[in-house]
Amino acid sequence: MEKTYDPQSIEQTLYQNWEEKGYFKPHGDASQGNYCIMIPPPNVTGSLHMGHAFQDTIMDTLIRYQRMKGKNTLWQVGTDHAGIATQMLVERKLEAEEGKSRHDLGRDVFMEKVWEWKAQSGGTITKQLRRMGASVDWDRERFTMDEGLSKAVQEVFVRLYEDDLIYRGKRLVNWDPKLHTAISDLEVENKEKQGHMWHLRYPLADGELTADGKDYLEVATTRPETMLGDSAVAVHPDDERYQALIGKYILLPIVNRRIPIVADDYVDMAFGTGCVKITPAHDFNDYEVGKRHKLPMFNVLTLDAAIRSSAEVVNTDGTINTSLDGSLPERYAGLDRFKARDAIVAEFETLGLLEKIAPHGLKVPYGDRSGVVIEPMLTDQWYVAVAPMAKTAIEAVENGDIKFVPQQYENMYFSWMRDIQDWCISRQLWWGHRIPAWYDTNGKVYVGRTEAEVRAKHDIDDAIALRQDEDVLDTWFSSALWTFSTLGWPDNVEDLKTFHPTDVLVTGFDIIFFWVARMIMMTMHFIKDEDGKPQVPFKTVYVTGLIRDEAGNKMSKSKGNVLDPLDMIDGIDLETLVEKRTGNMMQPQLAAKIEKSTRKEFENGIEAHGTDALRFTLAAMASTGRDINWDMKRLDGYRSFCNKLWNASRYVLMNTEGQDCGPNSPDYQGGEMELSLADRWIIDLFNQTVKTYDEHMASYRFDLAANTLYEFTWNQFCDWYLELTKPVLQNGTEAQMRGTRHTLVNVLEAMQRLMHPMMPYITETIWQRVKPLTGVQGDTIMLAPFPAFDAAKVDATAMADLEWVKQVIVAVRNIRAELNIAPSKPLNALLRGVSAQDKARIEANQAFFATLARLESMTILGEGETAPMSTTGLIGEMELLIPMAGLVDVAAEMARIDKQLEKLTQEIARIEGKLSNEGFVAKAPPAVIDKERAKMADLSRDIDKLTEQKAEFAKLEA
């Protein structure tokens, strides 16, 4: 093996070999069961971020683990067409390169441009997935707009329409006035803003007065421009101030519209004056109030968010109301909503109807892609009536057919599903699945798989023009079919029978409603078991938290704190990193600040760590459901872990290759084999480690599974067992050396199989080198059997004896550290309180004590026999004493301790000064203050320890 571990030299070659040889494919033998995971399809034009790297590590660990357990595994890969994101990207590119809009090109030519863009950049994320070591079946790669999935989408739409679960209606949606499309709640970013609350006077009609004699009601609003569309003023039914006015009318200023005063529990009596203007066409809460009171909806905004020349009046059932007057003042027509706001407030002031303007903090909804304020808008859209499907989907989780890990996310799921609204599935875009609906010249709608099918079904002559709906489906609609459409539905259902329901879905909590819930509903509606029972899409939903930066902030381009997983794998120099973080920014004014923080945090850039170190770090940090603060130091630590494993393997191979390693090894001479206590102990410990690892994997505790591997490999195998082999390999009999060599190669080989799911590359490399020494067959570790716990291998005696030996060695090492005695200096130990078992252990393990503790002698003191001045350690009931005379230069040690005490005392005084400074405590973040306090506590402990040592030396001096 190479002297140093260099991941760059092994990873890509290995992956290419795995892929070419078809190791990622299902092997077809279902005797141990089938196992399937569907990758959440990333945006086709996107690139890998830390969230992807995290989830892909979890999924690949599960797939590799189950594959080695003998399961017929499929990790289904694919990408999402990401309607709005992709269309915007291509539109920006078109504008920059050709100075044209999509409308200049027309729909068909623009769509060709998008497909070209997809072909050019669509492979980026799949290349990056390969770099992460993802063992997906690339031959089955799908795309949400490929021919098969498009057919599935069409089929689902038509069937839902035929089942009366899809309809077209005029309802309130999140409208993006810049992109001219409805968007989902997930694409709306609510930002905290400091705005105003305008208090307006609404005159009472018909001479009515309030209880305190006023001829108006005072309403407070953050959006005075929408008052042109008010349909009512609401008060709480129990509010005594206004009870006499319920059912009376307001004369709405500026438009002179009579609107009713209605009673509704939605109103908070304690907030403001207890009177709320109701604008059902421009506010989601008001829309619900309007439905309850059957109020007409006055839509006063155009799709560009400007004031209309006259309001569109709509009934609560979505039909147009032609009897009510929707006229609006001419002076406002065409005015942008925010300019209209200023003009309307000015007019209220002129009319003497502006009570006051107060500062007010509020959440303003912005389009996460367009960056403009989103407008609740009444538009004609297609909807899925999801309530009937939601009932079955709720029951699937209630009865345990689907489990959430961690379980707390079930509550989030239930709260959403029990308050579910119809799903708006149409988008005013060009890139996406076009809605399979056609209109005749009278506006009558026909739904079918194709225009030909529509004409045949409804007997429409070719001479009659039909126009296909211009809208496309919400991206989440096709994603909702992901588990069954990718397996061949509706045409080919063989794979569906094999791999569905899938086993686990790995996803973030933020899309439980948008994706997870909709997959459950759609799958259970369309996929049934042979007995007709609705089939779930997956048995377990493993919910991950977000990966945040080291300070706990969400990673975002605008913050300049995004980390690219590939930069941690391959490394990146500082200048390239700065350019990457500050180039092509939406907000270029932030570039200088981002450059400064990047140069401070990564003054030498980021060094290459390799895929295995990154994967292991992500697994080790995967505590269920919690957000993770990224920690570069842990990544550095796990890179060192890879080095440790590499160097340990080199030690094993240097001592075993070309040697007799016992039965099954190529150089076995047929002699006897004797296992040392250390050999028996490591075999037992490895066996127990396998059991613990399996338990953690079964409960999706990847962090505990990773820590189990780390503890065994570094702390037990490397730090203890390899050291314990040295006395045997140097001075043992032939049978003992054969036994230790046999144990070394067999445990190392099995360790690679145990670690492989999390660290695929380094383990394959080491396994290929060590397997010939064990007689193990197989072309790749990927298909080798996963280690299994064997109750017959439990060796409690070896475990207890060796742990006792370790305690003795640790006690001696601690004494050396405390007294500053060189590790190479031989020591003589005295023992008191020695049991018969202790005595037997001492006699049997002299070689270990001589080599690892550098004990020249171990003398048992007789009863009542006194010992010279010694420093002691306890091992159970046995006392270990090291006579101190002649071991140390007492004066030099006392001087050293005094010097250390002085330094520590000064440091404590410095921190105390800091913490007593009121200015520092007031300004410093709590985390910084806690860190300083923890540092002071550590220093105090160090002072106590040194003071004790000084007292011991003082006794010697006396």
From Swiss-Prot:
What does the record give as EC number?
6.1.1.9
Write out the annotated subcellular location. Answer: Cytoplasm
Its catalytic activity? tRNA(Val) + L-valine + ATP = L-valyl-tRNA(Val) + AMP + diphosphate
State whether keyword Ligase applies.
Answer: yes
> Broadest EC class?
ligase
Superkingdom to which the source organism belongs: Bacteria
Record Pfam families: Anticodon_1, tRNA-synt_1, Val_tRNA-synt_C
Q: Which residues cross the membrane?
A: none
Identify the main location: cytoplasm
| Positions that bind ATP | K557
Q: Which InterPro entries match?
A: aa-tRNA-synth_I_CS (IPR001412), aa-tRNA-synth_Ia (IPR002300), Anticodon_Ia_Val (IPR033705), M/V/L/I-tRNA-synth_anticd-bd (IPR013155), Rossmann-like_a/b/a_fold (IPR014729), tRNA-bd_arm (IPR010978), tRNAsynth_Ia_anticodon-bd (IPR009080), Val-tRNA_synth_C_sf (IPR037118)
Q: Which UniProt keywords apply?
A: Aminoacyl-tRNA synthetase, ATP-binding, Coiled coil, Cytoplasm, Ligase, Nucleotide-binding, Protein biosynthesis
GO cellular-component term (any): cytosol
What the entry lists under SUPFAM superfamilies is as follows: Anticodon-binding domain of a subclass of class I aminoacyl-tRNA synthetases (SSF47323), Nucleotidylyl transferase (SSF52374), tRNA-binding arm (SSF46589), ValRS/IleRS/LeuRS editing domain (SSF50677)
Q: Which residues form a coiled coil?
A: 887-956
- Motif segment ('HIGH' region): 42-52
**Similarity section:** Belongs to the class-I aminoacyl-tRNA synthetase family. ValS type 1 subfamily.
PANTHER family referenced in this protein's UniProt entry, alphabetically: VALINE--TRNA LIGASE, CHLOROPLASTIC_MITOCHONDRIAL 2, VALYL-TRNA SYNTHETASES
- General function of this protein: Catalyzes the attachment of valine to tRNA(Val). As ValRS can inadvertently accommodate and process structurally similar amino acids such as threonine, to avoid such errors, it has a 'posttransfer' editing activity that hydrolyzes mischarged Thr-tRNA(Val) in a tRNA-dependent manner.
Assembly notes: Monomer.
Q: What is this protein called?
A: Valine--tRNA ligase
**Organism encoding this protein:** Shewanella oneidensis (strain ATCC 700550 / JCM 31522 / CIP 106686 / LMG 19005 / NCIMB 14063 / MR-1)
